A protein has these predicted regions:
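Hydrophobic alpha-helical transmembrane segments in multi-pass integral membrane proteins
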Residues: 118-128
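Hydrophobic residues within alpha-helical transmembrane segments
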Residues: 10-13, 56, 88-92, 111, ...
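Core segments of transmembrane alpha-helices
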Residues: 14, 57-72
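Structural signature of hydrophobic alpha-helical transmembrane segments
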Residues: 78-89
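Interfacial loop-to-transmembrane junctions
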Residues: 95-118
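Long, highly hydrophobic alpha-helical transmembrane signal-anchor segments
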Residues: 1-21
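Membrane interfacial helix-start motif at the N-side
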Residues: 43-64, 100-102, 106
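Cytosolic, membrane-interface loops and tails of multi-pass inner-membrane proteins
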Residues: 23-53
Length: 128
């Protein structure tokens, strides 16, 4: 398996973990009765749960680009050291982004986000 596909697998695992953590803290902050019910009415959640939700939404905004780039690189066989480094940068920056966002660290969070975009750029440039 290519480096890019390996990091795609890691990104999928991160997505599942992120969803589980976010859902757990959201349910805890809203109450077990709400979590087990139809959830028709909106309820306030804790700051922590809200940050987890926004961090997940942010991850979902960049993940499709990563999936597409990793797939194109694997299918076309155009993987290079640069694309592998881009995949690693994207993944590890996204891992770093979660605790930075949840703990409210603004500057480092933004740096992690930019590094993840730089990783996507490193993956895309050799394909052009």
């Amino acid at each position: 398996m290519t480096h890019e596909l390996t990091y795609l697998l890691y990104a999928a695992i991160l997505l599942v973990a992120h969803c589980l953590i976010q859902a757990t803290f959201s349910d805890l902050s809203k109450g077990i009765g709400w979590a087990l019910g139809p959830q028709d009415e909106a309820r306030d959640q804790s700051v922590f749960a809200g940050r987890l939700q926004r961090a997940l939404r942010n991850y979902l905004e960049t993940l499709p680009a990563f999936i597409a780039l990793a797939a194109i690189i694997a299918i076309t066989g155009q993987g290079t050291e640069t694309t592998a480094m881009g995949a690693a940068l994207y993944f590890w920056a996204r891992v770093a982004y979660i605790p930075c966002y949840v703990s409210g660290v603004p500057v480092i969070r933004s740096i992690a986000w930019f590094v993840s975009l730089a990783g996507l750029a490193l993956m895309a440039l050799p394909l052009l």
